[in-house]
Amino acid sequence: EDELLPINFDNIPNAANVDEHLWEFSKTFDPENKYTIPHYWGTLGILYNTRLVDEKVDSWDILFNSKYSGQIIMENSVRDSFVPALKMSGYSINTDNTDELDEAEKILIEQRPMVQAYLLDSARDEMIAENAAIALVYSGEAPYATEYNDDLAYVVPKEGSNVWVDSWAVTKDCKNTENAEKAFEILCEKWKAMGN
């Protein structure tokens, strides 16, 4: 708290190129859009191989299906791995209810023997190489993966997921806010901003 400097948007006119939806979403954590510039957004979902998975993939429960034992990759992140277990149980991913968290933990412990690996960035590469059938990944991994393997598809399950946004900010201990603003101005050029 109180660690960021307000951004001087007069020095970053290209910030106007950032999509309005990102600015609106950013208000969930920066209500006045004073401290951050949204850059990139995405979701958490399931990347799966349509040749290896012979059923409709539209629910988190496929990550817990013993039929795919040894073919499941989960994120090596406590927060992200809890999302499927919480959502398929009907709970908020932001719950702080101990009973709900305990239930999700139990589901994940039961899933453990079915999981091939807990990975971060390399899950995409394992899926491209067809070393697994199903993986929990960020949406940003999907276009790259599907470009290299036509049998891969990405879905956000019907129970819902999280939507996230990465943003830029300037910390109070920044020694050169002028250069930070120049960097933001370049990063918000129209062709770059539209790509996000």
Regions found by a protein language model. Name each.
Residues 1-131:
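Extracytoplasmic ligand-binding site segments that recognize negatively charged/polar headgroups
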Residues 45-52, 86-88, 164-177, 195-196:
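A bilobed periplasmic-binding-protein/Venus flytrap-type ligand-binding module shared by bacterial periplasmic
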Residues 59, 103, 107, 138, ...:
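Short amphipathic alpha-helical coupling segments at ligand-binding clamshell hinges
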Residues 60, 123-126, 142, 180, ...:
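Short, hydrophobic alpha-helical packing/hinge segments within bilobed ligand-binding/sensory domains
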Residues 73-74, 189-196:
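Bilobed periplasmic-binding protein-like "clamshell/Venus-flytrap" ligand-binding domains
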Residues 101-110, 148-172:
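Periplasmic-binding protein-like
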Residues 124, 128, 146, 171, ...:
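Generic hydrophobic alpha-helical scaffold/packing signal
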Residues 128, 134-151:
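A ligand-binding cleft/hinge motif common to bilobed small-molecule-binding domains
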